[in-house]
Regions:
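Acidic, small-residue rich beta-repeat scaffolds with periodic aromatic anchors
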Residues: 5-13, 20-34, 106-195
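Beta-strand C-termini and the immediately following turn/loop, strongest in propeller blades
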Residues: 44-49, 88-94, 99, 127, ...
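A short beta-strand motif characteristic of beta-propeller blades
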Residues: 63-68, 110-112
Length: 195
C-alpha cells in the first residue's frame, strides 16, 4: 500500500502542467529604466529593505518617490501618453493583474486592476491597450468552486480612466475552456499608445 501511495505522489508531482504564455517565466528586472514621453519622469524597480518599489524620479528636480510598492514580479510597464501615469501588468498567484500608477497632487499613488466581483476566480491579463485618456485591460477568467474545481470561463474587458482612475465599461463574455486556454497560450497583446 505504501508503494502505491508513493507512486501516486510521484505521479502528481511529476505530471506535466500546461505552460501558458500569459504566465511568463521572465519579468522586468530591477534597474531597467523607463523614461516618460515628455522626459520629465523616469521609473525603475528598486529593492529597499527586501521589498521592491517603483522608484519614480523627477528628472527636473532629481527627487525620487518610493511610495508605491511593487508586490510581485513586473511583467509589463509602459508610460501613458500624458506622462502622469504608468500602466503595468504584475504576476499574482494563478495569473496576473493590472496596475495603474499615477501622479496626483505631486504624489504617486496606484490602483490595482482585476475583474470585479466577489466570486472565487483566477484571472490573467491577455491584452492591454493604452489610449490618450484611458487604458483597456482584457482578462481571461476562470471561476472556481471552493474546492478548486473550475466551473466556468469568461473574458472580462474593462477600461481605467487615467485621470480619475475609475473603472468603467466592464464587459463579460462567456467562453469555453478551450478558448480560455488558447488565450493563455498566446503571448499577451500589449498595444502601446500611438505616437
Amino acid at each position: 500500500m505504501r508503494t502505491i501511495g508513493l507512486f501516486l505522489i510521484f505521479l502528481v508531482v511529476n505530471s506535466p502542467r500546461p505552460s501558458y504564455t500569459a504566465y511568463p517565466q521572465t519579468s522586468i528586472l530591477q534597474g531597467v529604466r523607463f523614461v516618460s514621453p515628455d522626459g520629465r519622469y523616469s521609473v525603475e524597480l528598486r529593492e529597499i529593505d527586501r521589498l521592491s518599489y517603483y522608484a519614480i524620479e523627477d528628472t527636473k528636480t532629481g527627487d525620487v518617490d518610493h511610495s508605491v510598492v511593487m508586490p510581485s514580479l513586473l511583467l509589463y510597464l509602459r508610460w501613458a501618453p500624458n506622462s502622469r501615469a504608468i500602466v503595468a501588468v504584475e504576476h499574482i498567484p494563478h495569473g496576473s493583474c493590472g496596475r495603474v500608477v499615477y501622479l496626483t497632487d505631486s504624489k504617486w499613488a496606484d490602483i490595482e486592476v482585476r475583474p470585479p466581483g466577489k466570486e472565487l476566480k483566477d484571472s490573467a491579463v491577455v491584452g492591454v491597450t493604452i489610449k490618450a485618456d484611458y487604458v483597456h485591460y482584457r482578462f481571461a477568467v476562470r471561476y472556481i468552486q471552493p474546492n478548486g474545481m473550475p466551473i466556468r470561463y469568461a473574458f472580462c474587458d474593462l477600461d481605467v480612466s487615467l485621470e480619475t482612475r475609475v473603472i468603467s465599461n466592464v464587459r463579460w463574455t462567456p467562453t469555453s475552456r478551450v478558448e480560455w486556454a488558447t488565450s493563455l497560450e498566446q503571448k499577451p497583446v500589449y498595444n502601446p499608445p500611438k505616437a
